[in-house]
Curated annotation (Swiss-Prot):
Protein's organism: Rattus norvegicus
CC annotations in GO: cytoplasm; mitochondrion; mitotic spindle pole; spindle microtubule
Family under the similarity heading: Belongs to the RMDN family.
Protein name according to UniProt: Regulator of microtubule dynamics protein 1
UniProt GO molecular function: microtubule binding
Pfam families assigned to the protein according to its UniProt record, in alphabetical order: RMD1-3
Alphabetical keyword list: Cytoplasm, Cytoskeleton, Microtubule, Repeat, TPR repeat
TPR repeat locations: 168-204, 222-258
Length: 310
């Protein structure tokens, strides 16, 4: 519609220009000289035809450009609409716990440069890797695949909190295959990206929770790993249970009961701090959490075991 209206506006201008040139040709067609340029009638008539051809060529060029613009804009709108549709399907499958169907859907678009698709691909690959039926060899391949997707997402859009979050998660996962030195060195990178994710989106409870896990992990680091870290690094990463507790509570404040593992870790952290009353409070909540996933079931079992030992 926009292209048609532009063409309609252009045609009168072309007709007007053609008539003006023809009038000039007739007025100069007597063979006399006119003005300082001294055109002869035949020259003007010839130039008229050339000018008309030029106008036609210009019009076609203009229309070609306009057509290109309209088609390009339509393609962008269509592509955007398609991505939005895929994301809606992906989020529905994720919320429904359809891990394998989600992975099958998203891997069709693994060559995409869309950051929203890429970080979801990282998450989906990691979720498949965590399934009980996934072999150790397949798990390793999937975790490195997830890291590559997360890396591409981050390179595509450094302001995406989700890209920072999943890049940090995936680096942590592959650390199990790269030795203690690399794993400890990566801890700095992981912390940096979790902190950036929180900065970009302070309302994302998952990023805050993961920062809590980072603190908890280094608070309970075995003495031999701590010793290795001290030998390898001048300032090895470290944290405390109090700091971990702060992040777990903050995550709960942002989004109450968002994740069974956050409830479990609140209970476990209070146990580490010898506060059995508050530990029991959070462990009961973890045990009672509705089991939507395999992880939820495992957390229910662990919470029940810890409560038995109190």
């Amino acid at each position: 519609m926009a292209l048609s209206s532009r063409l309609w506006r252009l045609l009168p201008l072309l007709r007007g220009a053609e008539q003006s040139v023809c009038q000039l040709a007739r007025s100069w067609g007597s063979g006399g000289r006119c003005g300082t340029w001294g055109f002869r009638g035949s020259e003007v008539t010839g130039n008229t035809r050339a000018f008309k051809r030029g106008l036609l060529f210009s019009a076609l060029s203009y229309l070609g450009f306009e057509t290109y613009q309209v088609i390009s804009q339509a393609a962008v709108v269509h592509a955007t609409a398609k991505v939005e549709e895929i994301l809606e399907q992906a989020d529905y499958l994720y919320e429904s716990g359809e891990t394998e169907k989600l992975y099958q859907l998203l891997t069709q678009y693994k060559e995409s440069e869309d950051v929203e698709l890429l970080w979801r691909l990282a998450r989906a690959s990691r979720d498949i890797a965590q399934l009980c039926k996934t072999s150790e060899e397949e798990k390793k391949v999937l975790l490195y695949e997830a890291l590559e997707y997360a890396k591409r997402a981050l390179e595509k859009k450094g302001s995406s909190f989700a890209a920072h979050k999943w890049y940090a998660i995936c680096i942590s996962d592959v650390g199990d295959y790269e030795g203690i030195k690399v794993k400890i060195a990566n801890a700095y990178v992981i912390k940096e990206h979790f902190e950036k994710a929180i900065e970009l989106n302070p309302k994302d409870a998952t990023s805050i929770h993961l920062m809590g896990i980072w603190c908890y992990t280094f608070a309970e680091m075995p003495w031999y790993q701590r010793r290795i870290a001290e030998v390898l690094f001048a300032n090895p990463p470290s944290s405390t249970y109090e700091e971990a507790l702060k992040y777990f509570h903050r995550a709960e404040e942002v989004d109450p009961n968002f994740y069974s593992k956050n409830l479990l870790l609140l209970g476990k952290t209070y146990l580490k701090l010898n506060n059995k009353k508050l530990a029991a409070f959070w462990l009961v909540k973890a045990k009672s959490y509705p089991a939507h996933t395999e992880e939820d079931k495992q957390i229910q079992t662990e919470a029940a075991q810890l409560l038995t030992g109190l």
